[in-house]
């Protein structure tokens, strides 16, 4: 499960800063401020993990989202040597114990291993 993310130099987002993800979120902002770009970053990663890749992301596969070419997708205020970068912090539930434990208020399934990690990469 993704805990937080940061996007840099993608379309109108110069640097989103660290955005902590919650079960319910409201995105507010003026037109062209990056709301849709932020939301479209999730399908971008979905199309990347759905296939075996040589690189970290499936930029040119348009199954879920299409940002166009790199030059168009890069923020116009970004420095020439900077690329588009993504950083995700996540909790990795590697094993789920599916045995049922009977407690007064019901049955529970609990994670037996919970790890926090960070995944980041830059496209240039």
What are these regions (language model features)?
Residues 1-124:
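P-loop NTPase switch/coupling surface
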């Amino acid at each position: 499960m993704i805990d937080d993310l940061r996007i840099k130099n993608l379309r109108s987002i110069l640097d989103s800063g660290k955005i902590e993800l919650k079960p319910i979120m409201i995105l507010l902002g003026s037109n062209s401020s990056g709301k849709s770009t932020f939301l479209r970053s999730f399908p971008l990663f979905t199309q990347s993990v759905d296939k075996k890749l040589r690189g970290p992301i499936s930029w040119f596969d348009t199954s879920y989202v299409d940002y166009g070419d790199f030059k168009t997708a890069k923020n116009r205020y970004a420095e020439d040597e900077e690329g588009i970068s993504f950083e995700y912090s996540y909790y990795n539930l590697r094993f789920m114990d599916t045995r049922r434990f009977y407690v007064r208020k019901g049955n529970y399934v609990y994670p037996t291993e919970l790890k926090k990690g960070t995944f980041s990469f830059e496209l240039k």
